[in-house]
């Protein structure tokens, strides 16, 4: 028998579970930004510097080996050269199996420019292919020189033959011809390095978060900003002479001591001219004591603006930018090969 009551509908709604996915912005890591800027090699791709034979070579391995254990955190920019001697025609000094590895590095990795020169003689085995990146049989390499770059003069001697001239502080001159297995791009790197060592860099930091608090090139080179012109006008009153400025740009301690002596002498003369001559011994004693107490560093703010920066100092102070050695071969692709004859 059927029921006369209609079927009641349940008014309760069934609960449904809804999954809500929140999307958060993802930021790339620091290494990703560095790879985007071309400063680090992308995973799976070879290091362009190592491919050209200017990084991670034999000289770098010898210096970083447990035998020497030097400059472990610094990049070594190096190339393979053949020592030649000058004459009517360039002639090799040693046999073809003997080459020379020349490189530069930084004693402290935070320095923006290199300050150490490395030289090593390489003796290859008979019939061995002179591949300096990863040779099948390691050649005999002997580290000959570790010199501060401030005591070394490096310049391009023959652009067509790809020959560099290296002069040490003892007047020893080396003529080094770039190994023929190196591409033309590598010699342009050395030309650029010579220009950097002679004139400095206007921009020397890879990381924009690092603030450069010192000048890396002399103010008298070229500066389009108006603030530098005002600084130069203020500095003209305190500059002793043009010869002193030239000595000062060298960054030598003898030149600086001479500058301090000249400044102290000028302060003494100006102080004496402003004071009347007194015959009293006591007053003269007071004057001499005042003259001796004149500080020499009161108007030496202009001194730092004419030096080449902290990279010449053995013990740098303050916040330093990262090393720029790897940026010589940081870019990838065919952009590394500029046309022959054009300077970098």
From Swiss-Prot:
Keywords: Golgi apparatus
GO cellular component: Golgi apparatus
UniProt keyword annotation of Methyltransferase present: no
Broad class of the protein's primary localization: Golgi
Entries under InterPro entries matching the protein: GARIL-like_Rab2B-bd (IPR022168)
Subcellular location: Golgi apparatus
One biological process term in Gene Ontology: acrosome assembly
Region (Disordered): 271-293
Function: RAB2B effector protein required for accurate acrosome formation and normal male fertility. In complex with RAB2A/RAB2B, seems to suppress excessive vesicle trafficking during acrosome formation.
Classification via PANTHER family: GOLGI-ASSOCIATED RAB2 INTERACTOR PROTEIN 1B (PTHR22574:SF13), PTHR22574
Entry's family note: Belongs to the GARIN family.
Protein name listed in UniProt: Golgi-associated RAB2 interactor protein 1B
Organism annotation: Homo sapiens
Gene name of this polypeptide: GARIN1B
